[in-house]
Amino acid sequence: MTYKIVSKYIKDLSFKIPGAKSYFLLEKNIRNHRVKIDVTSKKLKENIIEIDTNLYFEPKEKDKDNFKISILFSSLINYEKKIEDKELEKIVLIEVPTAIYPDVKKIVSLLFEKSGFNKFNLPEMNFQKLYETKKN
């Protein structure tokens, strides 16, 4: 065992549709939106790191009538003392986000479904590819 996810939870959640106009614009133009993801971490104790995965679903063009959807999903991991920094970086930026993304996806999809949007599904994310792109 190099690391173990000991806890995961929703730290913050925002699903705001300002009104009927926003609702119908979103329904009509849902394909004209993008998903942004930001992963940050901080060491809490020896061998324990909190990893925050922030997901934003937003329109490509900003407008005062636009909705705001974001989820901050936190994971606590316990890792071995002898782990190298490079390996720990990959755990934080690739492995943990990959492991928790199905939960985030399910939560966001359920919010959309319960808000009247049928068959909404977030795209798959390749955190390995995102990591490699950011490194170059």
Stretch-by-stretch model annotation:
Residues 1-136:
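N-terminal intrinsically disordered, cationic/polar leader segments
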